Structure formats: structure tokens, C-alpha cells
Amino acid sequence: MRHEVHVHADIPILEGVSRRQVEQALGPWLEYLDADGLSDVKSLEPDEPGLKYDEKELILYICWTGEIGRSFHPALEQALENLGPYCYEAVEVDLTEYQDNGEQEGKLLFVGPTAQAIHEAQRRCMVEDLDAILGRQFDKEQVAQVTALVNRLFDED
């Protein structure tokens, strides 16, 4: 069963990493899409760039919507794992799946140079999300208590 998915991320790449290295790292995803390189990846949405590596800014821009099947997730996850060593820092990759019944499901993936960097990015995202949600209802001191607990949980993990 196939359905639509949107992948979005701005991934900072280390200086000296070539387009070819990025394409090789993304190989499992490119192969899944039957694409020879980044420029062959087209989004279903015409205003989305797909996959673009800005060699001047050292950022891999991902803004892609496509139709996927069962083997998509392993291909994407392997590509992100391969890309990790080329990342300047760990960042989130936002994945949204659109179901046939009209519902959508969001998932955050992470890519980064080390497991520790990814762990810290996960912590940062969790704390930012909690701060935004709880800050609407509670004062800063109360939110800080929850943040301290989350930080402790991440430290123990």
C-alpha cells in the first residue's frame, strides 16, 4: 500500500564535504527513488526543491513530498545514518505521512555526527517543545521544574 510522505530538514554539512560524498551517503534513499543524484529528486509539490546541497552555505536542504511504499523507511533511515559523519551538528528531520483516510502522522528523525550529538539534539527539541507548550499555561519557574526533570531523564538515558 502506497501513500504520500513529506520530509523536511536543513542539515549543516562539514566543510570539505563534496556533493558526490553527500550523494553517496544518501545512496539508499536515492536508489529507492530511482534517482542517479540529488538533481534527479523531484517533489510531487512543484514549489518544493526536493534535495538540494548548497556547497557555498554547506547545507543540505530537504523539502520533498513523494509517494512511498513499505521499503521507504529503511532506505531513509540508512541514508541518514550514512550522512551522519558528514554533518556539522545533529538536527531533526521532520517526517509527515499522509494516510488515505485524510489523517497525517508526524515523526521526528535525527541525523548527526555522533550518537551523543543526536542525543543532545533530541534533548534540545524536547525541551523546546515542552517550553512552548507549558509556557502557555505555567510561569517560567514551573516550566523550569519540568525542564530539569527532562534533562535528568536524558542524563540517565
Please identify what each model-predicted range represents.
Residues 25-32, 39-157:
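Charged interaction segments
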Residues 1-31:
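Short, extreme N-terminal segment that most often corresponds to the first beta-strand
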